[in-house]
Structures are given as C-alpha cells and as structure tokens.
Amino acid sequence: MEITFLGTSSGVPTRSRNVSSIALRLPQRAEIWLFDCGEGTQHQLLRSDLKSSQIRRIFITHMHGDHIFGLMGLLASIGLAGSAQDIDIYGPPGLGDYLRACAKYSYTNLANRVRVHAISPGILYEDEEFTVSCQLLKHRIPAHGYRIAEKDRPGRFDVEKANALGIPPGPIYGKLKKGETVTLPDGSKIRGQSLCGETEIGRKIAYCTDTIFCEGSIELAQNADVLIHEATFAHQDAGLAFESVHSTSTMAAQVALAAQVKLLLMTHFSPRYLPGNSLDISNLLEEARAIFPNTKLAYDFLTYEVPRNRQEMALGVK
C-alpha cells in the first residue's frame, strides 16, 4: 500500500501545490485507487510514476470543485488512451448527474465502462483483501471521509514442517495456508495455524477532508496506521475554520490523538500560509506536534509506503 499525494492545496492551486487528490497504489494487484480528483490531477499523474491506465476505483469526498473538477478530464483521457478497464466511482448523490452532464455537453464518449455508486455511511466496497467504508463528516455540504482496511493475512507457511509431518503438496496446502484445520488420510488432524508464522496485521488508512473536528473523523481513524487529515488553517485562525467549516492543524492533531493512530499526515493547506507570510505551514506542523508528535506535512508527490505489521514508519520520496 503506497500513498502518493497529487495535490495538497486547499481551494485553489499554487505554484507548488495542486488541489486535492491522493493515489493509493496497490502493487500486488497492479491497481491504483484515487481519492478526490481536483483540477489538474491528470497533469500531476503525468509528472509522477503512476499510470492512469491502472486506475480502477475513484472515491470522491464531496462535490466542491477543488475535489472534482479534474474528474471528467481524467476519465476522457483514459478513454482516449484506449483503456478497456472498468472504473468504479464512489461519491455523494449527484456525482453521477454531474458526470453525465459533463459528458453530454462536451460530447464525450467514454471508451471504458464507468460505474458511479452513490455512497452512504457504512461499508461500500469489500473483496478478499480490502474493506472500504465511509462516514459523514461535518462540512458546509455533505462530505464523507473514507477508511481503507486491509484484511489480516496468515503468516508465512512452513513448507519444511509440512513435509516433515507427511502432508502431501497440493490443494491441502492452500487450506492450511488459510489457517484451516484439515484431516489427513490417516485420520490425523492438522491445524493450519500451527504451520504458519505470526498473522500479518492488516494495514488501515483514513482520509478525512473537508471537515471540522467531528466524531465521524475519529471513528474512521480508529487505530489507523495512517490518518490523512485536512489542516486548512492555523490555530490562531480558528475563527476562519469555524466559519468555513474546515479544520485547523490542532483539530487534525486532536483527531489523531483521540483515534490513537500511528501517523498523522496533514494536507489541504490554505494558500494564506505560503512562504513569506506571517505564518507558514511550518507553524501548522509545530502546532500539531504539540498535541500529536508523530505528525508530518504532506506535499505534492510525497510518496509514503505503509509498512506491514505496524513496524516503525519512515517517509520516502520517489
């Protein structure tokens, strides 16, 4: 699970930050899941090592332009490139109407099938590896945060030990690898767990934007390995945060602390904190770390690989 920030600015792009979009790369299945798609996202993809042809799912938090204005252009470009892969899009009611209107009035025919799913709180996608759920956040319009939970996996299967027990290779190995109990031809029973190493704990990521401090964020982020949370304003600008229903850096840190996450990655910064102003984002980082020390600032093209088994986390840029 590899997170790449494609846009980290709030509202409008700046010279160094595009508007909201995050890519979650799943190398084991050659897929990319996109979270929000602000204007210019496809340009950011071209500047990265990510392949738009691998995008299989897109999750939209809410219908503000800085989170959706890049979506139709990206879908059109993927279609023009000849990709025949289906794309599933999840977002608020109205997202499907918006995309249909864009396609109609721009005379755009998508080569691939695009399915739009209107979301509501709860589990919205599940397969053998992952569960994705959402919760309502607190913003000026309906907005949802997302939680991506990888399922626990059995530890490494000990083939040598299985051979020593006289277990013949074949389909039975598959059952044992899953931790199941099997009966051998001689009637003896073997517990799969006894042949596997320690269970690999599934990794968890929460994405919360746009929102002010709320219980929905805490619920989504509970015990997450990584919480990606908006930090539009500094603490001293809390009045602006309440007025616009956005978070301060201290609110993001309070969510991380309450949810007992491992790492907080702050994003969605107001352009008012560009270098040269009385406050810049280093001040936001200082404020957040006073509450939740393991806090980092996201920036465009930051890549972070979520480690397995909740090992010590380290940032890496590609």
From Swiss-Prot:
Belongs to the RNase Z family. Its EC number is 3.1.26.11. Homodimer. Zn(2+) 1 binds at residues 62, 64, 139, 210. It holds the Pfam family Lactamase_B_2. SUPFAM superfamilies: Metallo-hydrolase/oxidoreductase. The keyword ATP-binding does not apply. It catalyses: Endonucleolytic cleavage of RNA, removing extra 3' nucleotides from tRNA precursor, generating 3' termini of tRNAs. A 3'-hydroxy group is left at the tRNA terminus and a 5'-phosphoryl group is left at the trailer molecule. InterPro entries: Metallo-B-lactamas, RibonucZ/Hydroxyglut_hydro, RNase_Z/BN. Coiled coil: none annotated. Keywords: Endonuclease, Hydrolase, Metal-binding, Nuclease, tRNA processing, Zinc. This is Ribonuclease Z. Zn(2+) 2 binds at residues 66-67, 210, 268. PANTHER family: ZINC PHOSPHODIESTERASE ELAC PROTEIN 1. SMART domains: Lactamase_B. The active site is at 66 (proton acceptor). Binds 2 Zn(2+) ions. The keyword Hydrolase applies. Its cofactor is Zn(2+).
